[in-house]
């Protein structure tokens, strides 16, 4: 009898356990189906607002919100004062920070001193193109107004429309959630370079190409056009300089051939190039790019929640999530891998400091030669060396992760940039000697303050103008966007606490 009772009890436990397991499996299957359920066939209303995607993709949305955790402001001009001299006469000499989480991308664009202090939609220093990589409202407006109209006018033109930070609609189709390129210039660039278009690419390739919508080198191409009313307009169209190839020297040759310059240097009067964020181009030269590892494999690794597998949308440093990002392929310890990365970074830092020290001194020595009477003809070759030196060195550092993505290429570019700067300085010795200044020593630029004084950057004035803008026009933009249903006010929480010139978290 006792044996029977034990057998019966055991059977009941097994039956209940199987029932619970079956129930759990069914619940997980429901979760999986719900997670993979696509949006409404007509698309998501309010598609530029990532909050509207949360009902279909709650896990992805919740993980995306965690990009808010990457909130540190690192003032790169304070860390590397030589950059101020390198960018004299250009907005980057005022303000340049290391990137934060995508949660802050749009607000950081609004806050930076580079975008100026417009008083209405027709004023300010920069074109509307400067919103392009910051918001899912950009593809919405391109669809709404047309590409050329979007690229026409000032940055402030769309201040009350471009109000949502980088999110779902930048990379996904709102009807199917499939990866999709949202900016026409990417396919034009890929075709010019001889690559497959986005649509022709494999899914694995698309997991990097959606990043290449923004993490690439580009310039603003002046484009004349007529609107529907026959009015002549000028658009500043984002263009990828890839028709000769995607290497640094091939892009350099492209720019030289069309005599393009982003600006004329404030000290040396050199026609300069500013590298943007060429992460994709440099990644393609590195071992991960060559082996077909995608950006998302490391920066958005797959994660498991019950029966559900999904891509972690907390885009960030893979070293913060090594068990999912690195250890699927690597067999070394986490600490050993971190030590390798640290070594790569230190080598980059060493060569960067040498290269930009020589570049800064070349600018200052050229400025001195001009002051003494040197002619443009005497300085032509010198300025070409400076232009190429800074372009190559800037390409090495403008993508903050390039030291890891392509360490050999980064060191090569910094060495090449340093060599070009030294060529300029050797020729400058002769020019300075001719004008009686053979003993000239360039002033030091060891701090941000010293460098900005040399670059004639009036920080107090720029900050005062910006703070006034933030108290006036920026507030109007947000009020209008909320009133018109373009912006969820919840998305503003904690987004504007810090910049390089204020910190509201400190009493």
Swiss-Prot record:
Residue positions binding heme c 3: 102, 211, 214-215
Annotated binding of heme c 5, by residue: 288, 326, 329-330
Gene3D superfamilies cross-referenced by the UniProt entry: Butyryl-CoA Dehydrogenase, subunit A, domain 3 (1.20.140.10), Flavocytochrome C3, Chain A (1.10.1130.10)
Record's catalysed reaction(s): 6 Fe(III)-[cytochrome c] + NH4(+) + 2 H2O = 6 Fe(II)-[cytochrome c] + nitrite + 8 H(+)
EC category: oxidoreductase
Effect of residue 218 to F: Reduces nitrite reductase activity by over 99%, but does not decrease the low sulfite reductase activity
Cofactor: Ca(2+); heme c
GO molecular function, one term: calcium ion binding
E.C. code: 1.7.2.2
Subunit note: Homodimer. Interacts with NrfH. May form a heterotetramer with NrfH.
Protein name as it appears in the record: Cytochrome c-552
Species this protein is from: Wolinella succinogenes (strain ATCC 29543 / DSM 1740 / CCUG 13145 / JCM 31913 / LMG 7466 / NCTC 11488 / FDC 602W) (Vibrio succinogenes)
Gene name linked to the record: nrfA
